[in-house]
């Protein structure tokens, strides 16, 4: 038997808020392995950045393909390109990355910042120890 469908029983699509749309764009960009690798490579090369050619060589990808990935990351506000002479040097947009992390954790610990103060205390410190890929599996 088919249930009666009423206007009240149909979920109405609501577009994401501008903040949610920005986060979705960033996660869509990072949801592709090569782009995630590019962002991680650019973080390593902060604050100087590296050229498209250097990125392409490091990730073993054609330069035009790499440029396409960089354009997607730039639209997601995760990388910044700046012209230096005849080259474009790319850097991680650390403000954009920070925004994304802050968006994810905006309501952390029911809005009590003191409860999760140490959540990122070890990031970017000499004591910071990132688990190897094998360790992360268990």
Regions flagged by a language model, labelled:
Residues 70-71:
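Short, hydrophobic-biased segments on the C-terminal half of alpha helices
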Residues 18-62, 84, 88-97:
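N-terminal helix-turn-helix DNA-binding core of bacterial DNA-binding proteins
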Residues 77-79, 85-86, 101-103:
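Short, Lys/Arg-enriched C-terminal cap helix and immediately downstream tail that follows
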Residues 57, 74-75, 80:
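Alpha-helical residues within the helix-turn-helix
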Residues 2-22, 40-44, 94-138:
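Amphipathic alpha-helical dimerization/coiled-coil segments
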């Amino acid at each position: 038997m088919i249930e009666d469908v009423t206007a009240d029983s149909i979920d109405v699509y609501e577009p994401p808020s501008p903040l949610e749309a920005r986060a979705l764009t960033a996660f869509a960009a990072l949801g592709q392995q090569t782009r995630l690798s590019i962002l991680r490579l650019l973080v390593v090369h902060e604050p100087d950045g590296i050229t498209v050619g250097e990125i392409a060589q490091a990730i073993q990808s054609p330069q035009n393909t790499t440029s396409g990935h960089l354009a997607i990351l730039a639209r997601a506000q995760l990388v910044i390109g700046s012209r230096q002479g005849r080259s474009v040097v790319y850097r991680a947009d650390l403000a954009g990355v920070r925004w994304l992390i802050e968006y994810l954790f905006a309501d952390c610990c029911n809005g009590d910042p003191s409860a999760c103060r140490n959540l990122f205390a070890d990031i970017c410190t000499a004591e910071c120890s990132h688990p190897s890929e094998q360790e992360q599996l268990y």
